[in-house]
């Protein structure tokens, strides 16, 4: 399953340089998936000599991410992330690891989570950094941070290749963009010496998730691309068990947990689930910092 926004922009994997995108090629890929309406929407996008207009695509992606922020606000992504990274930070402090601690948001988009954390969970020993390949999204994140007078930073780069690497890696709504076969490589990248912990929040697949996504995006999103991609996100989300196996196999230095598979005291699936990991040497301190919530942490094997 494909999302339109995943196809509108491409980068050279070796250099990170942006590459031209052929409009007809991505429309054909969508048609091959049976997504006629999505292909038609792509065919209407401005192009020069058959190649998508980069400036238009950048403006479109910023607009889409502005709409995505509505989802982030309603699902309290900022507060949700703060509640999950705070125990890891406290465990690092308790163990004697000295700050500043660098929290890096992978695929930050326009930086909602980083900006929320900077505004509501600021600490002298914590740095919040948002990273995204798309320079237009990074510029918009920087503009919004300046407007809010926030002390955080944003970088157009590979989150795993930063000059000042992360101590805690986080993301929201990113895991489902990776094919299942690439999840192992993603988690293997967490094995860098500097990485102490991670928190990745994403949609949880279920029979009712596509319907819920359709209702939400029909009522909250104006852009057709936002509506289409939102439903696709719910449809292509990975099962927590699959994510758990990838993390346990490819990030063996970490104690890995899943949180939030079921609504409390019911068999109903949560809309979002969280994958959490810390170095094994910090596992006891982290579970202690979670307090009573530690009972809800399910080990991943």
Regions from the PLM with identified roles:
Residues 58-84, 88-92:
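Class I SAM-dependent methyltransferase Rossmann-like catalytic core
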Residues 178-190:
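A short, conserved alpha-helix within the catalytic core of class I
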Residues 249-301:
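Conserved Class I S-adenosyl-L-methionine
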Residues 104, 110-158:
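Class I SAM-dependent methyltransferase SAM/SAH-binding core
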Residues 203-251:
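C-terminal alpha-helical "lid/dimerization" subdomain adjacent to the S-adenosyl-L-methionine
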Residues 170:
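A conserved beta-strand element that flanks and buttresses the S-adenosyl-L-methionine
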Residues 194-204:
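Conserved beta-strand signature within the Rossmann-like core of class I S-adenosyl-L-methionine
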Residues 1-54:
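N-terminal auxiliary segments of SAM/dcSAM-dependent transferases
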């Amino acid at each position: 399953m494909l999302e339109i926004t995943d196809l509108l922009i491409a980068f050279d994997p070796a250099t990170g340089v942006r590459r031209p995108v052929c409009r007809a090629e991505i429309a054909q890929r969508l048609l091959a998936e049976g997504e006629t309406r999505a292909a038609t929407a792509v065919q209407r996008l401005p192009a020069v000599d058959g190649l998508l207009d980069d400036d238009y695509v950048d403006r479109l992606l910023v607009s889409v991410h502005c709409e995505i922020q509505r989802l982030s606000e309603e699902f309290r992504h900022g507060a949700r992330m703060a509640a999950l990274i705070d125990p890891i930070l406290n465990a690092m402090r308790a163990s004697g690891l000295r700050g500043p601690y660098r929290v890096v948001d992978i695929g930050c988009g326009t930086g909602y989570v980083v900006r929320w954390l900077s505004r509501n969970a600021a600490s002298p020993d914590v740095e919040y950094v948002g990273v995204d390949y798309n320079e237009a999204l990074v510029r918009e994140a920087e503009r919004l941070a300046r407007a809010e007078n926030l002390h955080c930073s944003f970088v157009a780069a590979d989150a795993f290749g930063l000059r000042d690497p992360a101590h805690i890696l986080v993301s929201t709504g990113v895991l489902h963009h990776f094919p299942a076969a690439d999840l192992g490589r993603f988690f293997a990248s967490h094995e860098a010496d500097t990485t102490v912990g991670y928190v990745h929040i994403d949609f949880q697949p279920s029979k009712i998730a596509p319907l819920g996504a359709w209702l939400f995006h029909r009522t909250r999103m104006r852009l057709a691309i936002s509506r289409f991609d939102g439903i696709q996100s719910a449809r292509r989300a990975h099962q927590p068990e699959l994510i758990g196996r990838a993390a346990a196999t490819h990030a063996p230095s970490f104690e890995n947990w899943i949180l939030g598979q079921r609504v409390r005291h019911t068999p109903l699936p949560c809309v979002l689930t969280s994958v959490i990991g810390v170095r094994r040497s910090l596992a006891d301190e982290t579970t202690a910092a979670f307090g009573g919530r530690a009972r809800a942490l399910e080990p991943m094997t």
